């Protein structure tokens, strides 16, 4: 039987090499944008050197360590950066680089402004606008979904222009920055993502198996979730990238339980645990706010995958029972 993926997605060679546990890298995955080498526990490596005299984490040293990695990886400086431990009072208004860490040094949230090249932001924004002109929905997906189904399935949007543009053009380029980001802030997330079904990467052209497209304009504000919520289906922190053109006082992401507003702008990236912290997006009164959310549901590892659309996958699932 010819699957949906075979009909619509070009086969891509994905090579994965598993290293012996205890060596410098326990797994390496080769992607079109280069290899990703990961050390388990890398994100909390050298924690002993980040302790203060009382045995607690030295926030200044931890911040310097994170900024050093980000500066080297992204080849840019992040000025006026701040750091908070997760159980401390978070910054109320975030406009510069910001990290929230656990007491073992692992990153709960990372905000890095102006990570994407301006030309890339403008190119994607222009194309998204062209695509949205012919769409009625303000959301869309690429990759896999599971939602309330007992299996993972190929999102129907992959047969449409938006889904194809995401998977074939956007995701391969954004994945380059995702790899950089996760290398700096969460090797644990990389380890989890590369442990998933190889077919997910071939389908979505990204470390994350799923991508959500969210369009927000003053005229279409009614479609979205307007109450603070958690992304309870997620298993890893998500990586969010922003496009469009909107005022820097609007469209912020608010982590309501922490009284923290992150004033994101086009070109920025935000990494955080949406399944742990309640959040909501503020209104905009002008312009256009586009958010791309790269995520992984719990079901991506625990549920079967039939490499087909929801309807056809349901039929296969019933036949296997």
Curated annotation (Swiss-Prot):
Q: Which UniProt keywords apply?
A: Dioxygenase, DNA-binding, Iron, Metal-binding, Oxidoreductase
**EC number(s) given by UniProt:** 1.14.11.80
Tell me which residues bind Fe cation.
Answer: 229, 231, 279
MF-aspect GO terms: 5-methylcytosine dioxygenase activity; double-stranded methylated DNA binding; iron ion binding
Q: What is this protein called?
A: Tet-like dioxygenase 1
- The gene coding this protein: TET1
Q: What is the effect of changing residue 234 to A?
A: Nearly abolishes enzyme activity with DNA containing 5-methylcytosine
Instruction: Give start and end of each Fe2OG dioxygenase domain.
Output: 198-298
């Amino acid at each position: 039987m010819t699957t949906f993926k075979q009909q619509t997605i070009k086969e891509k060679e994905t090579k994965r090499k598993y290293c012996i546990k205890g060596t410098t890298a326990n797994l390496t995955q080769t992607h079109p944008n280069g290899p990703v080498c990961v050390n388990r526990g890398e994100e909390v490596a050298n924690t002993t050197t980040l302790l203060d005299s009382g045995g607690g984490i030295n926030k200044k040293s931890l911040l310097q360590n994170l900024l050093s990695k980000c500066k080297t990886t992204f080849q840019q400086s992040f000025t006026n950066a701040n750091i908070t431990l997760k159980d401390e009072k978070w910054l109320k208004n975030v406009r510069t680089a910001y990290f929230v860490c656990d007491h073992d040094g692992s990153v709960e949230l990372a905000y890095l402004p102006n990570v994407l090249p301006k030309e890339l932001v403008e190119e994607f924004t222009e194309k998204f606008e062209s695509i949205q002109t012919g769409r009625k929905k303000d959301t869309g997906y690429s990759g896999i979904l599971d939602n309330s189904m007992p299996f993972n399935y190929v999102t129907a949007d992959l047969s449409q222009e938006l889904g194809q543009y995401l998977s074939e053009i956007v995701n391969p380029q954004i994945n380059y920055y995702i790899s950089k980001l996760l290398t700096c802030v969460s090797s644990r997330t990389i380890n989890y993502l590369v442990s998933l079904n190889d077919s997910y990467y071939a389908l979505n052209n990204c470390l994350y198996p799923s991508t959500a497209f969210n369009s927000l304009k003053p005229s279409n504000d009614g479609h979205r979730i307007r109450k603070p919520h958690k992304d309870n289906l997620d298993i890893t922190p998500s990586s969010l990238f922003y496009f469009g053109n909107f005022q820097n006082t609007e469209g912020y992401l608010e982590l309501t339980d922490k009284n923290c507003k992150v004033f994101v702008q086009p070109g920025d990236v935000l990494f955080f645990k949406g399944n742990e912290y309640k959040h909501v997006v503020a209104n905009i009164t002008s312009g256009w706010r586009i958010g791309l959310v790269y995520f992984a549901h719990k079901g991506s590892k625990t549920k079967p995958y039939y490499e087909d659309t929801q309807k056809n996958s349901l039929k296969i699932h019933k036949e296997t029972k």
